[in-house]
């Protein structure tokens, strides 16, 4: 599925859930050392103090390298688990800092999937595609009313527009990029 997503959306960023990765890393560590490894793991994802983008990702990558150096000899499988697709753990760092806590994990998506499964289980069998889409719409509509934590100010909208331009139209050598041609409004 990941390969198909890359084919269809080649410029998109894919975020791995940092919570699930933490669980996977800790599963490879003896219980008596898990609190130490867990604290070091979460230190990787502490705020970097850098603006969103490549500098912020570089700081987090340096922290991950320090984690690997610290625990590599004692827990090689845990370090290998962390380093597997590491760049996908840092995708959220390209977005506005106000969004980081909400988009670095997949809990809101999983909750929506769980609610859909629960409702389908109660119904038993859906008579057709239309009823399935109606149920899915109802679940997503209700869930979207409860999603909180992602504030959209004109500044964050501008950051997201700049990120979109970087992903869809990366600058070439000698091409001055630094301004956004679109007008940002409060309604955007």
Predicted regions and their residues:
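Catalytic center-proximal scaffold of phosphoryl-transfer enzymes
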Residues: 1-188
């Amino acid at each position: 599925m990941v390969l198909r997503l890359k084919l269809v959306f080649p410029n998109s960023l894919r975020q791995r859930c940092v919570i699930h990765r933490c669980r996977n890393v800790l599963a490879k560590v003896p219980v008596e050392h898990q609190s130490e490894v867990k604290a070091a793991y979460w230190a990787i994802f502490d705020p970097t103090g850098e603006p969103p983008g490549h500098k912020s990702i570089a700081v987090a990558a340096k922290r991950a390298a320090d984690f690997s150096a610290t625990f590599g000899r004692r827990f090689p499988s845990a370090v290998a688990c962390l380093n597997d697709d590491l760049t996908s753990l840092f995708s959220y760092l390209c977005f506005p800092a106000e969004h980081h806590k909400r988009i670095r994990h997949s809990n809101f998506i999983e909750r929506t999937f769980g609610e859909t499964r629960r409702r389908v289980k109660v119904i038993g069998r859906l008579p057709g595609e239309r009823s399935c889409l109606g149920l899915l719409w109802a679940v997503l509509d209700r869930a979207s009313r409860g999603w909180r934590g992602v504030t959209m100010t004109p500044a964050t909208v501008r950051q997201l527009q700049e990120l979109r331009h970087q992903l869809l139209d990366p600058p070439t050598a000698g091409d001055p990029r630094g301004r956004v041609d679109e007008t940002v409004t409060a309604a955007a």
